[in-house]
Every structure is written in C-alpha cells, then in structure tokens.
A protein has these predicted regions:
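Post-signal peptide N-terminal segment of secreted/secretory-pathway proteins
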Residues: 1-67
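Generic helix N-cap/helix-start motif at coil->alpha-helix transitions
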Residues: 1-7, 34-45, 58, 69-79, ...
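Alpha-helical repeat scaffolds
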Residues: 20-31, 56-68, 91-104, 127-141, ...
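TPR-adjacent "capping" and linker segments in tetratricopeptide-repeat scaffold/adaptor proteins
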Residues: 35, 172-179, 229-253, 284
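Long, contiguous interaction/recruitment modules in multidomain scaffold/adaptor proteins
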Residues: 180-183, 189-237
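Structural motif corresponding to the intra-repeat A-B loop/turn of tetratricopeptide repeats
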Residues: 17, 53, 87, 126-127, ...
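C-terminal soluble interaction/assembly domains
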Residues: 251-333
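Residue at a conserved register position within TPR or TPR-like alpha-solenoid repeats
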Residues: 14, 50, 84, 123, ...
C-alpha cells in the first residue's frame, strides 16, 4: 500500500511540474494495483498522457484496452482515431471512423463532427477521390457550414458531362462556393451553350460585382463574354412566350427544359415550374433525370422547398446527376 501511495504522489507532482514521462511511469505502475480504483478513468488518463507525449502506439494500446473493458466513450474514440491518424495509419483511421459514423447513424444520431473530419482527412491522405467526395457529403449533411460546402463543391467542379457540371456550378454559386474567376467564366459559358443568355449575364455581373477578375486580360475577356450574353437577352425574352407555346405543343422534353431554365434565369419561377413539369411528363430528355432536376431547381427558386426536395430525390438514371441532385436536396432541406 505504501508503494501505491508513493506512486500516486509521484505521479501527481510530476504532472504538476509538466514531467509527463515520470507521471506515466508512476501511474502505469499503479494501474494493476489492488488499491487502484476506477480503472477506466486511469486507462483514459494514461491514453491522454501518451498522446500528449506523441507516443501514439501506446495511446492506441490504451484506447483498445478501454474498448475491451467497455469504458470507451466518445472522447476515447476520438483520441484513438486521432492517434491512428497522427501515427500515419490512414487506412486504420478511415476504417475506425467509418464504423463510428455508421454506429451513430444506425442509432438515428448525428455522428460527431471530429469523426467525420478525421474520416475525410484520411480519404484525402489516401488520395481516394470517391471517399473524399462522400466524406464532404457527410459533413454538409450533418454540419452544413459554408466552409464544408465550399470544399465539397470544389471537389465536384473537376469535369464531367456538361449537364452535371452546369448544375454543380449552379449549386456552388447558390452556396457561395465559387471562389475563382475561372469558375464564374465556365458557368457563364455553360449557360450560353445551353441557350441561356439571361443566366450567363447574371453570373458575369455577379463576378464583376465581386471583383474576382484582377488581371486586365481576364477583365477584357470576361467583359466580352458579358456583352455577348447581354446582346442576346432582348431577343431571348421577346421570343420566350412563343418558345413556350411551341414547346408545350411539341413532343420533345428538351424544348421544355430550355424554356424552363430560361424562365428561371429571368426570375419567372412559376412559369419555369410549369415547363419543367411538362418535360418530366414527356420523359424523353437526352439526359436521364435532368427534367426532375430542373423541376427541383424551379420549385426551389419558387420557394416551394418540400416540392423541390421531392423532385431532387426523384432524379434517377445518371449517377453523376443523382449525386448533384442529392446535394441540391440537402441544400433545399
């Protein structure tokens, strides 16, 4: 008993003076003592001390001991995941945090943010793009802050079919995640290619208002793009009602989709909903799921978020577009 008391005092004094090494030796000596009460708290304290000393293998040993003993709480699990990560074992970090995330979801709870962040960081270290994107999606699902959205959207703006890219850029614009001048330029060009000068002009006006172009050559080039879009707006607006009637009478969903998006670009969201609903009903668009996605956008812009979520969730047939629709659904909720 005397040795136990001496080690307790030695450990306390060592901790008070910042001598973690001596404290660890004293408390480890006492861990198996018959006089040591509250073993769970002692194991957790030793785990923390080893972590603070950057002895991650030993911290992991105590973390696993806590798990086997049934006294691993959220703080222990977080420290164990951090120990795996700091040790450079990113596969173990990813697997461990993925399990913790799944457990929380099965209980109907939001996973801890640090579990999600460590899982995402591991995916990035492992250069697993699919895992990285899924990690960002989880973050914005449970903790939808601007930084998470910005990181997610930058991972989405790396190519793909034009329809997917256009709607990814639209979402990035919606959440304030367009950070580079080239992002605005590409969104405007994609809109123009789809016959949407109103949207293209609006995008470029926002870009200039935010002063995202700093080089004179970029300013000149994008001024020409803005002027090109503006020069088409008058004719586009003048012919929109006739185009709407022709699309309604025709058999092609593509015409309805163009009209719906044109109406949206001019703030006429009720008309956009009607045209998009026609496209959905016809069901013969070139890209599977695009009509439902455009309908969701129109409903979202019209302020009918429940209808927008329903439409986004109905997007099927194109995996890349389904992913974008899922993110739009998260935004609309």
């Amino acid at each position: 008993y005397d040795s136990f008391v001496i080690n307790e005092l030695r450990g306390y004094c060592a901790l008070s003076s910042g001598d973690n090494g001596t404290a660890i030796r004293a408390y480890e000596t006492n861990l198996g003592s018959q006089y040591a009460s509250n073993k769970g708290a002692r194991v957790k304290a030793l785990m923390q001390l080893h972590y603070n000393n950057r002895n991650y293998p030993r911290a992991i040993e105590y973390g696993r001991q806590a798990q086997k003993g049934g006294f691993a709480d959220g703080d222990v699990n977080t420290l164990l995941a951090q120990s795996y990560y700091q040790q450079g074992d990113f596969k173990a970090t990813r697997a461990f945090t993925a399990d913790l995330i799944s457990q929380a979801e099965r209980r109907g709870q939001a996973p801890r943010q640090n579990y999600l962040q460590l899982n995402l960081n591991s995916c990035i270290k492992l250069k697993d793009t699919a895992c990285e994107t899924a990690g960002f999606e989880k973050l914005v699902t449970y903790y939808p802050n601007p930084e998470g959205w910005a990181s997610l959207m930058q991972s989405m703006l790396k190519g793909g079919p034009d329809v997917t890219l256009l709607n990814s850029f639209r979402l990035a614009s919606e959440v304030g995640a367009l950070s580079r001048g080239s992002d605005y330029t590409e969104l405007a060009q994609l809109a123009l290619e789809r016959g949407l000068p109103g949207e293209a002009a609006s995008v470029m006006e926002t870009a200039f208002a935010r002063k995202v172009f700093t080089e004179q050559r970029d300013i000149d080039r994008n001024t020409r793009l803005l002027n090109s879009a503006k020069s088409r707006i008058a004719a586009d607006k003048a012919g929109l009602a006739a185009a709407d009637r022709a699309a309604a009478a025709g058999a092609s969903a593509e015409d309805d989709l163009r009209v719906a998006q044109a109406y949206m670009s001019y703030g006429q969201h009720a008309q956009a909903v009607v045209a998009a609903e026609r496209a959905v009903k016809k069901g013969n668009g070139k890209t599977p799921g695009e009509a439902q996605l455009v309908l969701g956008l129109a409903q979202f812009k019209a302020g009918n978020k429940p209808a927008a979520v329903k439409a986004f969730k109905a997007v099927k047939g194109d995996p890349s577009l389904e992913r974008v629709a899922k993110l739009w659904s998260l935004r609309a909720q």
